[in-house]
Amino acid sequence: VLSEADKSNVKGIWSKACCHLEDYGAETLERLFFVYPQTKIYFPHFDLTHNSAQIRGHGKKVFLALHDAVNHIDDLSGALSRLSDLHAHNLRVDPVNFKLLSQCVLVVFGVHHPGALTPEVHASLDKFLCAVSTVLTSKYR
């Protein structure tokens, strides 16, 4: 459960990303595919080269969804219900991949905002991403 301090920390660090959703999203996916190459199997039709239009487009979608989750931090289930259905029933993404993606999101924030990603903010952002992952995998059962 996210505390009020966690919510404040997440909103604060996220405000630094809201103007860079496509860039941060693309960088997150590129890191995901490089560090965890097994995740590429979900994107066989994508051009996975650096800065490709498909990676930028999907990265932006991922970060727009996270942006929406931040804006609805008190109702993550409602905000992410459609995406939960999509990933569980249509895409059938292995739930472990959400944790891998979350790790890459944390790295991107650390790279771009090292001073803002204090240990407390890091912990809050990690808790938030875990909460998002829990919602996205809730319909797998």
UniProtKB/Swiss-Prot annotation:
Gene Ontology terms: cellular component: blood microparticle; haptoglobin-hemoglobin complex; hemoglobin complex
One Pfam family hit: Globin
GO process terms (BP): hydrogen peroxide catabolic process
Amino-acid positions noted as binding heme b in the UniProt annotation, renumbered to this chain: H87
Alphabetically ordered keywords of this record: Heme, Iron, Metal-binding, Oxygen transport, Transport
UniProt binding sites for O2: H58
InterPro entries registered for this protein in UniProt: Globin (IPR000971), Globin-like_sf (IPR009050), Globin/Proto (IPR012292), Hemoglobin_a-typ (IPR002338), Hemoglobin_oxygen_transport (IPR050056), Hemoglobin_pi (IPR002339)
Signal peptide positions on this chain: none
Entry comment describing in which tissues the protein is expressed: Red blood cells.
Single GO molecular function: haptoglobin binding
Domain Globin: 1-141
Keyword Membrane set for record: no
Keyword Heme: yes
Source superkingdom: Eukaryota
Function: Involved in oxygen transport from the lung to the various peripheral tissues.
Subunit-structure text: Heterotetramer of two alpha chains and two beta chains. When oxygenated in vitro, exists virtually only in polymeric form. When deoxygenated, forms tetramers, octamers and larger polymers.
Family: Belongs to the globin family.
Further comment found in the protein's record: Displays a pronounced Bohr effect despite the lack of the His at position 146 conserved in the beta subunit in most other vertebrates. Shows chloride-dependent sensitivity to organophosphates like ATP and 2,3-diphosphoglycerate (DPG) but not to inositol hexaphosphate (IHP). Binds molecular CO(2), not bicarbonate as reported for other crocodilians.
Name the UniProt record assigns to this protein: Hemoglobin subunit alpha
Organism: Paleosuchus palpebrosus (Cuvier's smooth-fronted caiman)
